[in-house]
Each structure stands twice: as structure tokens, then as C-alpha cells.
């Protein structure tokens, strides 16, 4: 631990925290409440080994944000994705898995077909995408602390009134 602390400079993007002994769930809730990206925890007696292990765990924090729906990408045999943009700008920020229940998924497909529109000018061609006109907002769960959407899933959607 001392060697690692010495390798990380004070101007580094990497933050080195002090040891926080205690119950992992309680510590995670404090980290999540503070708006941090997550935590790395390890068994006190374990040594670092490269590759997957249960001795070292990375626990990530998620948040929910509101975005504008640009379109839905659907290909046979693959999961569907909602293509999302910053609200009001139509600037693409990433995609979110469409992992909602069947009723909501069918309502989404219907809404997408009713609001079909051209792709945003800056977007590369995506043949499997049904683009929509501006006006559909969505709530997306995604990793906290990332510029673009990562590990994102669509939670809900509605017409922007």
C-alpha cells in the first residue's frame, strides 16, 4: 500500500484513499451518497494477482439521468439499444440497453414508429436504426462519473411536453 501511494502523484487523476476498515455495504453507501464513482475493496490478507479474483472487488456506482431519444437500433438476434443525446442539443452521448418489460417495450416501438424522423446530421449511418423526431425524453440508469453513457439501461420514456 505504501509503495502504491508513493507512485501516485498529487496531480494525478487517480485518487488514493486511506484504508476504510469496516462493513463493505456500509462503506459503499457512504461512497455512493458522496457521489463518488465506486470503490475497490480487498481482503486484508490478500496479495494482488492479475486476472479475475474474489479477493479484490470493484464496486461501481450508478446514477439516473434524463436524456433525449434519438432513435432505437434493432437487429434480429441482438439486444435493442436506445440511442441517447444531451437534452436540447441532439448531441449523441451513447446508447442504453432496452431492458424494460414487454408492455413498455411495445409502447416504445409504437412511439418510435409514430415519431419517425431523419437521423441527426452529425450521426454516421446506422442501417438498423429507426430514428425519431425530437420530443421523446428518457430516464437512463448509467455508470456515474463517465462523460459518455456506459453500462446504461433505459428505465422509462415520455413525450416532452
Task: Give the label of every model feature segment.
Residues 1-161:
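Catalytic cores of nucleic-acid ligases and guanylyltransferases
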